[in-house]
């Protein structure tokens, strides 16, 4: 008897179907509830139509589930043309009887509406198409257009409810779009659309620091769990990609294998080198040698016949090659041999989510063992702290997932003196932190390096001087005769030898 109750409760659980939209199914913990309706709401240009088309296209191509697309706005020809820009051949699917586009768009010549509004004819057409094509998925774009054509909102709501009820009765999973006036205002323009649907997904395209940032939020998923909050997404060549950072799991393996920094003395300071799956951050003022350490890191990968990829956001390819040559490193040779790939771009050329997707796709294509980003601080310009933090988490999480050693640089705002490396929460995400700084000693400028942090390993705690030579950095002894080096005001420590003998026996209070 107990087993029967358990079996019955399992059957009563809400079943989900995957949408095939990358990252979205993670946010929904498996996909959309089957045989239910989902309202996708957003302002103009947020990607509502793309979402509904991608849902149908992936359902047909990945899960062999035929679909029906009902358009109240655009003509079928326009929809087919727009979908082609994402590589989706809808005409081919139509010819294969796997997709049917039902045209309910208004007459371009206009029409006079007389009598009572009724969707009975349309409901029967949709029901017939579902039976004919054995459709499992339906998309309606958009129900806002229906409200715009008729004044009696309560009547339109009743008819939309009838349509959704019929689709649920048939057993298809429906996605319908609606337009809202403001990204953080009412869910839908007419204030009633959300009440006829089981689930609500909000798409936003918010202006932040003179840039548009797209986010997705699952507001409601009736009868089942989902991830809360806004998640960044981008629209690329393959459609919508959601960055579900909250779905990332700390399940990656941890390696004890060491790799070289490319600088022998720095390896000794790190207890034998970096761990091969670690994230290293070099932070310091401009000109302290951060890019040089990146170059040595890449050179060591080349010497070990390993692939490396460099994303440069502050210098051009020609400038990088010239600077590397001054340290005896030949980037052009590495690229010609297929062991190095350099990608240069202005941070302002696109949004952080697009930069993240480019990094992930390039890593997936090139399959490097080492990744370098020069610099993170350039990408932080003109974006919100939360957006930047999500970007860093996305990059580090993907690097660890792929078991890639990552070397990132960060330019400190202070030219001399102590500086914070925790403002953007970078320090807690990275495994190793190298502090580089200028110090003034006896009227001359010197450079100092310190291994500030290294997870899981002993490391040298001393602050050591280093100089830049034609072969890269040369690390010297520590500033043993000075203290408060990183404060910007170092002063000499008085040794016992400089104290007169008469005072040596006096104990300190």
From Swiss-Prot:
Protein's UniProt keywords contain Cell cycle: no
Known catalytic reactions: L-seryl-[protein] + ATP = O-phospho-L-seryl-[protein] + ADP + H(+); L-threonyl-[protein] + ATP = O-phospho-L-threonyl-[protein] + ADP + H(+); ATP + H2O = ADP + phosphate + H(+)
Gene transcribed to yield this protein: kaiC
Cofactor note: Binds 2 Mg(2+) ions per subunit, one in each domain. Mg(2+) is required for hexamerization and phosphatase activity.
CDD domains: KaiC-N, KaiC_C
Protein's recorded name: Circadian clock oscillator protein KaiC
GO molecular function: ATP binding; ATP hydrolysis activity; DNA binding; magnesium ion binding; protein serine kinase activity; protein serine/threonine kinase activity; protein serine/threonine/tyrosine kinase activity
Reported cofactor(s): Mg(2+)
Residues that, per the record, bind Mg(2+) 1: 49
NCBIfam families listed in its UniProt record: circ_KaiC (TIGR02655), PRK09302.1 (NF006799)
Enzyme Commission numbers on file: 2.7.11.1, 3.6.4.-
Residues the record lists as binding Mg(2+) 2: 291, 314
Binding annotation for ATP 2: 286-291, 327, 447, 453-455, 457, 459, 461
